[in-house]
């Protein structure tokens, strides 16, 4: 299309140029044609534009005067016309050039327009393709949206059905809730009635328990003083043992240095004796090999003074070794007895601390029913950890004492057995053959490095023993100081407020009176009062245990424990656990409160978790009981 329009435009431009040339072509005047016809003899002048040469004109002018002037005028007029025509043609040519330039510019513009149209067409085609792709994607998206709408409609229908089911279930649950609230209100009313009945009985009982707790406090103070005195005695005994061990250590160093010197001298003497015997034997051989046989001379035997001196030294060394063995055995026995006494004292201290802890927890339970349970748990955990550390240290001390004593005994017995063996060698055979009195054998003592290693190992064991004893002292001091501070603080607090919060918590009617206030504190106090009322018979066993402990505290001092107590402790383990569990079981069978609904969960908790009674009775029991009452 663009090429056809271009060709058409070019054809139209050519036509316009032809018409313009035809219109503006110069026309020849009539006089010129006539001159050409008349003057046939001079065609050159006519063709050359009517201009004659000067000679001819002159001749003609001279020849024909009047006619020449007329012809000149006639010739001048066409020349002028031709000049005008030439001017007009030059103007026309310039115009034509301008028109050509304008046409070229138009052509360029047309070509530029054609290129732009081509570009626009290409862009339109690209846009059409992009639009087609977009239309296809939109169609696909439309189909996907239709499928999503279908699925959404199905899910909406499903959710509507589920919402209907949930509404039905909610109605059913609301009905059940109303029924449960009615049942709970009935149960609460019955429990209030029972609690009102029990509160009247529990007031007198709690007053009596408070009096008993004050009496127990006095007993505990007396026991604390006894414990302090026994602890001071233990410290003195330990100091004496430490001094005795240091003295024995110095003596042992001196004896070992003397023994090492004597062993070195004995080694040298033995080597000299053997060397002398070898020389004598070689001399006897040489004498026998001589030509003249001589009667054999008796071998050179050491003098009786030297033999007696050697025997005395051997007897002295054996006696010293035996005395050292006896001393070591005596030291080990003393250490064992001291460890047994320390263990017995620690067991008694532990029992007394447990009794104090139980009594204090009981008093604290009566005074503060709710706010101190977490602190007691943390304290019990810390005390258990300290007790475990003390037990581990005691076990380590006992094992290391036994190991050190056994190693010492083995070393000493080995030395004695080596010294008791008979001497070997040629000299011994020769003396036996002579029939003389054989001296006691020389001791085959181990070399110096081995003895030094044994000494260093023994000293290391002694150092470790001393370090462990110091560690045990520090742990026991920390443990006793901690419990003394805690017991003094708690007893002071309870004595400063004897009739305040305890009576309010125990005698105030439990959570039945506090239930009117509608708070968590009332519920906690009521739970504590119910726990005290249900646990009243269990406290009788605890008082029996305290009486037995008081009787055991009046027995002889810690240095000489009764064998019956030790046997009972070995058979039955912890006295506190046996008495508490037996009393609790015996009274649980005869307790009339077990048939009541408020006391049954308490007994179930105690039966399911028997470890709770071994550490702390009342606080953990009430701590396990409070969450159920809060629920």
UniProtKB/Swiss-Prot annotation:
Domain of life: Eukaryota
InterPro entries, alphabetized: GM130_C, GOLGA_cons_dom, Golgin_A
Biased composition (Basic and acidic residues): 568-577
Coiled coil keyword on record: yes
Range of residues in the leader sequence: none
Compositional bias segments (type: Gly residues): 507-519
Coiled-coil stretches: 85-149, 209-247, 303-419
UniProt keyword Transcription regulation, yes or no: no
Membership in a protein family: Belongs to the GOLGA8 family.
Protein name: Golgin subfamily A member 8R
Species of provenance: Homo sapiens (Human)
Gene symbol of the encoding locus: GOLGA8R
């Amino acid at each position: 299309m663009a090429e056809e329009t271009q060709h058409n435009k070019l054809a139209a431009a050519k036509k316009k140029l032809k018409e313009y040339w035809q219109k503006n072509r110069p026309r020849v005047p009539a006089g010129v044609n006539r001159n050409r016809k008349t003057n046939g003899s001079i065609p050159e002048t006519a063709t050359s534009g009517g201009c004659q040469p000067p000679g001819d004109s002159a001749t003609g002018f001279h020849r024909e005067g009047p006619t020449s002037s007329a012809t000149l005028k006639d010739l001048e007029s066409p020349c002028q016309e031709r000049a005008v025509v030439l001017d007009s043609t030059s103007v026309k040519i310039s115009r034509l050039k301008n028109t050509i330039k304008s046409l070229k510019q138009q052509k360029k513009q047309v070509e530029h327009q054609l290129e732009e149209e081509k570009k626009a067409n290409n862009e339109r085609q690209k846009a059409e393709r992009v639009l087609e792709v977009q239309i296809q994607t939109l169609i696909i998206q439309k189909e996907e949206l239709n499928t999503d709408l279908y699925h959404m409609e199905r899910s909406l229908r499903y959710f509507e059905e589920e919402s209907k089911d949930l509404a039905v279930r909610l109605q059913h649950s609301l009905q059940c809730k109303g029924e449960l609230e009615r049942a709970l209100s009935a149960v609460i009313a019955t429990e209030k009635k029972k609690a009102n009945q029990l509160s009247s009985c529990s007031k007198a009982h709690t007053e009596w328990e408070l009096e008993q707790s004050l009496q127990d406090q006095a007993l505990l103070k007396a026991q604390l003083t006894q414990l302090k005195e026994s602890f001071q005695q233990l410290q003195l005994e330990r100091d004496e043992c430490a001094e005795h061990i240091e003295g024995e250590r110095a003596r042992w160093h001196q004896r070992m240095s003397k023994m090492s010197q004597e062993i070195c001298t004995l080694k040298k003497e033995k080597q000299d004796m053997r060397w002398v015997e070898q020389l004598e034997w070689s001399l006897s051989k040489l004498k026998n090999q001589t030509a003249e046989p001589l009667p054999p001379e008796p071998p050179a035997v050491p003098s009786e003074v030297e033999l007696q001196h050697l025997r005395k030294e051997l007897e002295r060394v054996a006696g010293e070794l035996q005395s050292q063995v006896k001393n070591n055995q005596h030291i080990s026995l003393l250490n064992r007895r001291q460890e047994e006494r320390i263990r017995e004292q620690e067991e008694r201290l532990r029992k007394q601390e447990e009794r104090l802890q139980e009594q204090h927890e009981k008093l604290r339970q009566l005074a503060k029913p709710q706010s101190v349970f977490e602190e007691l748990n943390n304290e019990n955990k810390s005390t258990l950890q300290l007790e475990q550390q003390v037990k581990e240290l005691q076990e380590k001390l006992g094992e290391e004492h036994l190991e050190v004593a056994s190693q010492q005994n083995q070393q000493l017995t080995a030395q004695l057995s080596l010294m008791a063996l008979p001497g070997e060698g040629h000299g011994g055979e020769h003396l036996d053959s002579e029939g003389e009195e054989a001296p006691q054998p020389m001791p085959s003592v181990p070399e110096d490095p081995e003895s030094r290693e044994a000494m260093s190992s023994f000293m290391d064991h002694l150092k470790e023993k001393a370090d462990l004893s110091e560690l045990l002292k520090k742990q026991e001091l920390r443990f006793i100081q901690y419990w003394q501070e805690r017991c003094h603080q708690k007893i002071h607090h309870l004595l400063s407020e004897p009739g305040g919060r305890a009576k309010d918590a125990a005698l105030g009617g439990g959570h039945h009176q506090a239930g009117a206030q509608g708070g968590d504190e009332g519920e906690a106090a009521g739970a504590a009062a119910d726990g005290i009322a249900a646990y009243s018979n269990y406290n009788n066993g605890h008082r029996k245990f305290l009486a037995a402990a008081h009787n055991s505290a009046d027995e002889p001092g810690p240095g000489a424990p009764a064998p019956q107590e030790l046997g009972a402790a070995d058979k039955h383990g912890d006295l506190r656990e046996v008495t508490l569990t037996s009393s609790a079981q015996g009274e649980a069978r005869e307790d009339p409160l077990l048939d009541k609904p408020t006391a049954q969960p308490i007994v179930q908790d105690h039966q399911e978790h028997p470890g709770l009674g071994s550490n702390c009775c009342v606080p953990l029991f009430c701590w396990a009981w409070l969450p159920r009452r809060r629920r």
